[in-house]
Amino acid sequence: MHSNSYEPNFVLSKTNKKHTDMDRKDFLKKGLLGTGMFVASASLGNTMKNEIDEIEPLEPIGYNHLPNPDSKIKDNSVIHKADTRGKADHGWLVSNHTFSFANYHNPERMHFGVLRVLNDDKVEAGRGFGTHPHDNMEIISIPLEGDLEHKDSMGNTAIIKSGDIQVMSAGTGIMHSEFNKNNDQSVKFLQIWVYPNKRNVTPRYDQITLDKTKSKNKFQQILSPNPDDEGVWIHQDAWFHLGNFENSTETNYQVKKKGNGVYAFIIKGSAEIEGQKLEERDGFGVWDISDLQIKATSENTEILIMDVPMMM
C-alpha cells in the first residue's frame, strides 16, 4: 500500500513532502530488492520507467520458510509469533513486518507462496506516506482503526475506515499517497502485497464497505479472483476471509483451490488452528491440506484467512 521503506525524509507530514530524485532512488532500492516498485523520473515527464530489479515472469517461488517444529502437523506448517516480526519505529509510524520488508531482511521469511508482504501499521495523527510508485503487485489495505485518506495517479480520492477493504492492481504503474485523515487519533491498518498472476495489467483501484453481520461466528469472503464474487478481486487465484468469533466457537475452512496454502493472521483475541495455539497478531501458515479446523479461545476473536497459491 505504501512504499517499501520508511525514511523520515520521504514520509512526512502533509506540510513537508520535499525530496530529491537521488533520495527517492536510494529509498526505493532499500525495499524488496525492487519487487513491486518502480522509479518515476522527472525527466521522463508522464512516462513511467522501471529502473530497478523486477520479478522474473511467473517463476516458481516456493514456500521460503522453515517448517514449524512446534506444530502438530509439523512439516507442512509454519508459525510466526507476533514478537518475532520485524519492526520499524519512526515515532510517527510503527510497522511490524511478518515478512522481509525495507530494513528488515530475514531470508527465512521472504514470503508465503504468493503472499509477499503482511505489514501491521500504525500512523500517528496527520502523518502519512507521500506520493510514491508501485508496479506489478496486488496491494490490499484493511483498516482496523481510524480513517485513511487515499489519492492516486488515476484521479481517485477516497477515505477508508474500519469495515472497509481497499485494493489496487498496480500493473503497468501507479502513484499514490496515504495519510491519516484525523488530527486527533492514530490510524491502524494491515497492508498486504500479493504477487499477481498477470503482469503489466491496466492499473485499477477499488474499495468496498463490508457487511460485518456476515462475519459473526463465521468467515465472510472479502477478496477473490472473480469480479462477480463477494468482496474485492485481484489478479491472482487467492481468497481472503474475515471472521469474528465468540469464545469456543468452532468452524471449518475449506481451501479454495488445490495447490493453495492458507495463512491465518489473528487480528485480535486467540484461537487454535489445527491444534496450534495462536495469540493476537500471530501468523500461522499451512499447506498440502484441504481444510482447516479452527476454534476461537477468547471472546471477540478476529481472524484473517489468506488462501493463496504456493507456487507461481
Where are these regions (language model features)?
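Histidine-centered metal-chelating micro-motifs
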Residues: 128-130, 147-150, 166-167, 171-179, ...
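Ligand-binding loop in jelly-roll beta-barrel domains
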Residues: 170-200, 288-312
